[in-house]
Amino acid sequence: MSLKNRYRETIRPKLLKDLGFSNLHQVPKVVKINVNRGLGEAAQNSKALEASLSEVSTITGQKALVTRAKKAIAGFKIRQGMPIGCAVTLRGERMYAFLERLINLALPRIRDFRGVSPKSFDGRGNFTLGVKEQLIFPEISFDKIDAIRGMDITIVTSARTDEEGRALLKEMGMPFRSN
């Protein structure tokens, strides 16, 4: 059963009861997933940006967008409008497919993985996770990469509090570390 169907048939009714909501629309859901990769070397090395764009596109199944510098920072040797990274916003079916792959395939492949930090919520029910290397995703092979790069994955939920967001992700199978 796909994660979307499991959410509709089992997770949503369980959260409705557990969180004490009266209406099905009050139950938190995943709204979107942002995958972001900042590349400091992209300003000098355009090949790094191209490789990064193709990797993020392969991992997410959606074309990555080039992010550009909003203003010039001399200390980082960047000018306004220079490419400094890439980002993808996933919604709908691709979002659920990516979340399922992240939870079931990618996270267990992290070395010495003991669970994700339950403190990585932003106060409004959204969860952000930093990944140190792209090799945890099965779509990326070691032979095809030029450098090991990480990325930030933000799971945006409709939850109003961190507790609601944590309950939603825990039911979806997110392996939280017990402190």
Swiss-Prot record:
What Pfam families has UniProt attached to this entry? Answer: Ribosomal_L5, Ribosomal_L5_C
Q: Kindly give the Gene3D superfamilies that the UniProt entry links to this protein.
A: 3.30.1440.10
What InterPro entries does the annotation carry?
A: Ribosomal_uL5, Ribosomal_uL5_bac-type, Ribosomal_uL5_C, Ribosomal_uL5_CS, Ribosomal_uL5_dom_sf, Ribosomal_uL5_N
Can you list the GO cellular component terms from the UniProt entry? ribonucleoprotein complex; ribosome
**Which keywords does the record carry?**
Ribonucleoprotein, Ribosomal protein, RNA-binding, rRNA-binding, tRNA-binding
Q: Which GO terms describe its biological process?
A: translation
Q: Which GO terms describe its molecular function?
A: rRNA binding; structural constituent of ribosome; tRNA binding
Question: Its domain of life?
Answer: Bacteria
Q: Which PANTHER family match?
A: 60S RIBOSOMAL PROTEIN L11-RELATED
Q: How does it assemble?
A: Part of the 50S ribosomal subunit; part of the 5S rRNA/L5/L18/L25 subcomplex. Contacts the 5S rRNA and the P site tRNA. Forms a bridge to the 30S subunit in the 70S ribosome.
State what this protein does.
Answer: This is one of the proteins that bind and probably mediate the attachment of the 5S RNA into the large ribosomal subunit, where it forms part of the central protuberance. In the 70S ribosome it contacts protein S13 of the 30S subunit (bridge B1b), connecting the 2 subunits; this bridge is implicated in subunit movement. Contacts the P site tRNA; the 5S rRNA and some of its associated proteins might help stabilize positioning of ribosome-bound tRNAs.
Task: Read off the HAMAP family from this record.
Answer: Ribosomal_uL5_B (MF_01333_B)
Q: Which family does it belong to?
A: Belongs to the universal ribosomal protein uL5 family.
What protein name is recorded for this chain? Large ribosomal subunit protein uL5
Give the encoding gene's name. rplE
